[in-house]
Amino acid sequence: MPSFDIVSKMNEVDLRNAVDNAVREVSTRFDFRGVEATIELKDLTVTLRSESDFQVRQLEDLFRNHCSKRNLSTSGVDIEDEPVHSGKFYTLTMTFKQGIDQPTAKEIVKYIKETKAKVQTSIQGDKVRVTGKKRDDLQETIALLKKSNIELPLQYENFRD
């Protein structure tokens, strides 16, 4: 039976490159001259630090632009609502999710079942396996999921006949 897996993975190399390019741009921008502004990456967590709330928001926008240039989706990112102020700096933390958590996996399965597609779904850890009798049914399911409003960036792998 044909099958494929739905996963949510973050390309760590592209994330590192987006951080490096954003840091490089911060060092050359006029509005960040004489200001201590940093962007750091550690274990899929990006920390933005600057001297004012407004500059942290500018760093966030700058970083999101560099992510979009590298085709990294920032839709599945856990981000603090307000920058945290401690001492001289404001800090904003963005955590990129890796894998599909249980509630989101159940939401994906429910969405596929509501569409009445001729496929079966099963949750396997941090991925969702979809099997069907025909390859066309699986491709139709992928098209439906791309149109859905699930907040995680989804990838489709292990497509087997």
UniProtKB/Swiss-Prot annotation:
Question: What's this protein's family per the entry?
Answer: Belongs to the YajQ family.
Q: Name one GO cellular component term.
A: cytosol
Q: Which CDD domains match?
A: YajQ_like
**Superkingdom assignment:** Bacteria
Q: What is this protein called?
A: Nucleotide-binding protein LPC_0632
Q: What is the annotated role of this protein in its UniProt record?
A: Nucleotide-binding protein.
Q: Which UniProt keywords apply?
A: Nucleotide-binding
List the molecular function annotations (GO) for this entry: nucleotide binding
Q: Which NCBIfam families match?
A: PRK05412.1
The record, for HAMAP family, names: YajQ
The record, for SUPFAM superfamilies, names: YajQ-like (SSF89963)
InterPro entries in the record: DUF520, UPF0234-like_C, UPF0234_N, YajQ-like_sf
